[in-house]
Amino acid sequence: MLDEVGHGQLSAERATELVAAAFRSRGLDLACAGEASVVLVEPETIRNLNFRFRGKDRETDVLSFEMDGPYGEMVGEVVICPACAEMGVEDLVVHGALHLAGMDHSEDFEESEMFRAQRTVMEKTRG
């Protein structure tokens, strides 16, 4: 996990736990699937990424990028902007990881299967 903004409230261990739980909820084993990274960034960085990869010139709270290295070692990266977050950073880690695990949602996120999956993962991982 890389915290470029000094958020300091999400440890690498917790990020790993959340990503692994999201993958398990979809019947996947992160240890077998590969590595996923979580990066916390400033609004300008996420706006630039959102424009570059999605053609949307605005800030967003989370982006997920699927990757596959030559040996399948890298599942992808979840990029989060805490300053833009409409939900908690931990929720966004799970949200991004569910995207990496193959889930998607419509514009009406709160009515989606992905929302229910995210809520279930968060309930199971709350300390």
Ranges and model annotations:
Residues 1-93, 97-127:
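An acidic/histidine-cluster motif and surrounding catalytic segment
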